[in-house]
Every structure is written in structure tokens, then in C-alpha cells.
């Protein structure tokens, strides 16, 4: 039986440049910091009265590298298969004008967030967990593209979007927009999140710093020598999903193939993940799909480096035993915030520079490991989006644990529990649209490759059922939240508590974290922080 291994690699370096404060400092600089905070509080109260703006109408795409929504013959992404150019197909009429379909985009984003929430419930063990739902769902989309029969039916439940051609087109466009370094480079027609719309000028003041916001997504599809892909499948994963295709000799030189794949991953995660494939590759392997996501961003409002100090964290609720000692960071400023008394939780956003992404932190009012797990079961993508839509900036003081989290998990078992077990079964699996006995033919149906794949799926013209079976889905994450930068003076957490901000948010009890790309609403990282790393 031929094997297909999905290796998903994520690295997130969430950084912030810093100003400094300590508990025992009450200098003139501290007082100046407090006065500035209170002035910003008044400013944010005024902004809150006009934070909802009209959503701009959809306009034609201006994104480079896409012509008619699918591809430009000069696009480097089309020259990744042994130097051979793949000509773009013509899109269906519905896409020929190149518009962002916000309805479909929002459904895709909701699907990613719902998947994250369901996966989190299946992984729940009372410990800290962190993963990238976007990376996992992205790989499932590539499997959906080549699936038929029961495999297609199971994978379709992740998205619940009947028009799969539109799904892939819009998802590919969202992933392209996700990687743009500035708001201006993103496809026109994606509105600002409401709370960002009220304060875009402020959040853009420091957005032009080079490297302030970096997202890089890479797909490497490594196939056995002589194993030929369906030309329609190959064309779509290159043109729509910008995948890199490489040929490896898993049978004759598995050690070399392993080295090359690990090197590819290390390159695209800037050496944060260097050994994704730790063991020998089985010689029966015919394909390995490696998905690497690299994210690095600086906070819009700097954390205060010298304020970082050991502090208590209470997994079972504030004031209870056991008590963990963690490195707690602190800062103050104007942050988007909302309290939902029906759900019994609060949400605060820590924006990154560039007006693009935000770390949203959701915490029960009286949080504990048990309360957070109960909240997770109550939450849905729609409820989370509703809370985000009702946020507005308020003067706040924030204490948040410094974290470096690593996670490695094989997802086969949990996927089977989620009802996605067919792709792992030699009997039930059908990925015959990826590669078939007829795959050497050249686009025999002609026209658009997405439409061709859909026609093959419906009519059964994709050839004999494939022996390709997913062996496992390996998911690795390296996630860092820290502070770094220049030294300056500010005040202490204790003293600032007395200055009367609107909000005091302390991450000293369990919380949920979402790193979200606001223009596309895609969740890059999702986690439950029940036990942050202990203070050194």
C-alpha cells in the first residue's frame, strides 16, 4: 500500500519591542507614562462613539500574480515543476471579474475556526495546547481537491461549502492575502474589523517598520520518482495554492529524501523546525505533503521589558492551589475589549503593527482549567466573531505570561474520532484525483482545471481507484510570545492599578488564545493556555 504523509510545521515568533518598568520605580518618567495613558483613555472613549463604519463595496482584485483569479503565465509560482511552465486555465464566468467573494471567504474563515474549536475539544486533556488550524485545514483542502467518494464526503464536512471550485479559488486568494506585508497590498474589498476601522490611523503610525509583520506559508509536495500527478490536480495546487513540487526517490534513497524535506522545512521556518521527519521514511511512500507556516510580528503597543518578573499563575482559579510561578509581562495602552455576560467571558485583543493581525485572548470571568474547557464547548465560530465585532478600544493594563511553547502531535487518531478516518483507511479512502492510471494524459477535458476535477469527481472519469492512503498527519508548532527592545522608564503594575484604567486584564488564570489575520479572518494559531512555561 502506498503511503502519503502530511507533515505540518508551524513556527510563530510573536515579538514586541519594549519600554521598561519595575514595581519599585515611581520616577517622573513613570508619572508621564501614566498621564499619557489617561489621555489615551479619553481619546479612546471619543473614538468608541464612532467605531462602526460602513463596509466598503467589493471591487475588482488588484493583487499581483493573479489574472482572472487563477494565474499569470509570468507568475514564478507556475514554474516550480522541474522548470516546466504550467499555463493557467480560464476561470468560470463567476470568477472572471476577479472579485473577492466575502460571503465565501467568511464561510471559509468560520470553517477554520470551527475546526479549531472541535479539534481542541478532542485534544483536551487539561494541559496547554497550541496548534495552527489554518495549516491543518489548508492540507485537508489539498486532499479534498483530489478526493472522491467517501473521502470527498468526509473532507467536505470541514468546509460545508457545496461549490468546491469557488471554495478553492477563494481559499487560495485568502492565503495569498494572508502573506501580504501591508494592508495596501491586500485584495480590495476586504473590510477592516470594526474596532480597527475606528482607530486605523493610530494603529498605522508605526506600521511601516520593516519586518513588523511577516507571514510566510509554504507547501511542498514531494513525490516518488516516476509517480505522475493528475495534470489538473498539479495545475491547481501550483496556480491556486502556490505549491512547490519536488521529485524524491523514497524507494532508492530514503535518507536523501528525508534530508531534502527537512531542509525544505527548516528553510521555510527560518530554522525553527529542523527535523520534522525524525525517523526513516518507509520505502512504500509515494508522496509527502509538507506545510510550513512562519509568523512573526511586533506588538502595536510595546510591552515593558523590565516589568517582566516572576508572578503567580493559578490553573485552578485565582487564589487556589497549586500555584505556578511564571514570567509575567506587563504593559498599558488602548486595547480592543468586550465582556460577554451571556457566555461568561471577556475578550481582549493585542494588535500587531501593520493593521493586519491580532492576538485575541478569551478568558472566563472566574477562570480555571475546568471553566475554560466548559467555555470552549459553548463557543462557536459565530459566537467568537460576534464578540470580536462588538469590541472597541478601552484604556487597559495588561499582564500576560511570557511563553515559548513547542508542540508535536500525530493527528491520525484524533482525526478518526472527528469523523475523518476514511482518508487513513485502505478500504474507504479514495484520493484517485491526485494521481490515476490516466494521469499521463494532458488535460484531456480541456478548459478550467478546477472544473475538470469536479467533472471527474462526478462522472468517475478520474481512472481506477488509487492505492494512495494517508499514513499520518504530523503537526509541529514552535510558538513564542516575548518582549525585546530598547530600555525606557514606565510604572509598575501595582502602581498603575491605582491610576484607574477602564480595564485591568491579568492572564494569571487559564485562557484561550487566537492569533487571527483580521482582513481574511483566518485563525493562524489557536490554543488553550492552562499551564504556561514555568519561570526560569
UniProtKB/Swiss-Prot annotation:
Q: Which GO terms describe its cellular component?
A: extracellular space
Gene3D superfamilies, A to Z: Alpha-1-antitrypsin, domain 1, Antithrombin, subunit I, domain 2
Name the predominant localization. secreted
Conditions for induction = Up-regulated by injury in larvae and adults.
Q: What does the UniProt entry say about where the protein is found? A: Secreted
Carbohydrate-modified residues: 355
Record key words, sorted: Developmental protein, Glycoprotein, Immunity, Melanin biosynthesis, Protease inhibitor, Secreted, Serine protease inhibitor, Signal
Q: What Pfam families does this protein's entry cite?
A: Serpin
InterPro entries per the record? Serpin_dom, Serpin_fam, Serpin_sf, Serpin_sf_1, Serpin_sf_2
Family note: Belongs to the serpin family.
Protein's name in the database: Serine protease inhibitor 28Dc
This chain's source organism reads Drosophila melanogaster
Name of the coding gene: Spn28Dc
Amino acid at each position: 500500500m502506498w503511503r502519503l504523509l502530511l507533515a505540518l510545521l508551524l513556527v510563530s515568533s510573536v515579538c514586541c519591542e519594549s519600554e521598561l518598568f519595575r514595581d519599585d520605580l515611581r520616577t517622573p518618567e513613570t508619572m508621564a507614562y501614566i498621564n499619557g495613558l489617561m489621555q489615551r483613555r479619553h481619546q479612546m472613549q471619543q473614538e468608541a462613539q464612532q467605531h462602526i463604519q460602513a463596509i466598503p463595496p467589493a471591487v475588482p482584485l488588484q493583487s499581483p500574480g493573479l489574472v482572472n483569479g487563477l494565474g499569470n503565465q509570468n507568475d514564478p509560482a507556475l514554474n516550480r515543476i522541474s522548470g516546466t511552465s504550467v499555463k493557467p486555465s480560464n476561470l468560470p464566468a463567476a470568477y472572471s471579474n476577479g472579485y473577492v467573494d466575502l460571503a465565501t471567504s467568511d464561510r471559509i474563515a468560520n470553517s477554520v475556526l470551527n475546526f479549531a474549536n472541535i479539534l481542541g475539544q478532542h485534544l483536551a486533556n487539561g494541559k496547554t495546547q497550541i496548534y495552527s488550524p489554518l495549516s491543518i485545514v489548508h492540507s485537508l483542502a489539498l486532499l479534498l481537491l483530489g478526493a472522491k467518494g467517501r473521502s470527498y464526503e468526509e473532507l467536505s464536512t470541514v468546509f460545508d461549502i457545496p461549490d468546491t471550485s469557488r471554495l478553492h479559488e477563494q481559499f487560495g486568494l485568502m492565503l495569498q492575502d494572508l502573506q501580504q506585508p501591508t494592508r495596501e497590498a491586500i485584495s480590495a474589498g476586504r473590510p477592516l474589523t470594526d474596532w480597527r476601522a475606528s482607530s486605523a490611523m493610530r494603529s498605522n503610525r508605526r506600521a511601516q517598520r520593516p519586518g513588523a509583520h511577516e507571514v510566510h506559508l509554504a507547501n511542498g509536495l514531494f513525490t516518488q520518482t516516476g509517480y505522475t500527478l493528475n495534470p489538473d490536480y498539479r495545475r491547481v495546487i501550483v496556480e491556486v495554492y502556490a505549491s512547490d513540487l519536488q521529485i524524491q526517490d523514497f524507494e532508492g534513497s530514503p535518507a536523501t529524501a528525508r534530508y531534502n524535506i527537512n531542509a525544505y522545512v527548516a528553510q521555510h521556518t527560518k530554522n525553527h523546525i529542523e527535523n520534522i521527519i525524525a525517523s526513516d521514511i518507509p520505502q512504500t511512500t509515494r508522496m509527502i505533503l509538507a506545510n510550513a507556516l512562519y509568523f512573526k510580528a511586533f506588538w502595536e503597543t510595546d510591552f515593558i521589558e523590565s516589568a517582566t518578573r516572576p508572578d503567580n499563575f493559578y490553573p485552578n482559579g485565582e487564589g487556589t492551589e497549586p500555584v505556578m510561578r511564571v514570567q509575567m509581562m506587563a504593559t498599558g495602552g488602548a486595547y480592543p475589549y468586550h465582556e460577554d455576560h451571556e457566555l461568561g467571558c471577556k475578550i481582549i485583543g493585542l494588535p500587531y503593527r501593520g493593521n493586519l493581525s491580532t492576538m485575541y485572548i478569551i478568558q472566563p470571568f472566574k477562570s480555571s482549567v475546568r471553566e475554560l474547557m466548559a467555555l470552549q464547548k459553548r463557543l462557536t465560530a459565530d459566537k467568537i466573531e460576534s464578540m470580536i465585532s462588538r469590541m472597541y478600544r478601552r484604556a487597559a493594563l495588561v499582564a500576560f505570561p511570557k511563553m515559548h511553547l513547542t508542540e508535536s502531535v500525530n493527528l491520525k487518531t484524533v482525526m478518526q474520532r472527528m469523523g475523518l478516518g476514511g482518508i487513513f483507511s485502505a478500504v474507504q479512502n479514495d484520493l484517485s484525483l491526485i494521481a490515476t492510471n490516466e494521469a499521463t494524459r494532458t488535460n484531456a477535458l480541456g478548459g478550467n482545471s478546477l472544473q475538470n476535477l469536479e467533472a471527474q469527481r462526478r462522472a468517475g472519469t478520474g481512472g481506477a481507484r488509487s492505492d494512495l492512503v494517508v499514513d499520518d498527519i504530523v503537526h509541529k508548532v514552535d510558538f513564542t510570545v516575548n518582549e525585546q527592545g530598547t530600555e525606557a522608564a514606565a510604572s509598575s503594575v501595582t502602581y498603575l492599578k491605582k491610576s484607574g484604567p477602564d480595564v485591568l486584564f491579568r492572564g494569571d488564570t487559564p485562557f484561550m488564545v487566537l492569533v487571527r489575520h483580521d482582513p481574511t479572518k483566518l485563525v493562524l494559531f489557536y490554543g488553550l493556555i492552562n499551564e504556561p512555561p514555568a519561570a526560569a
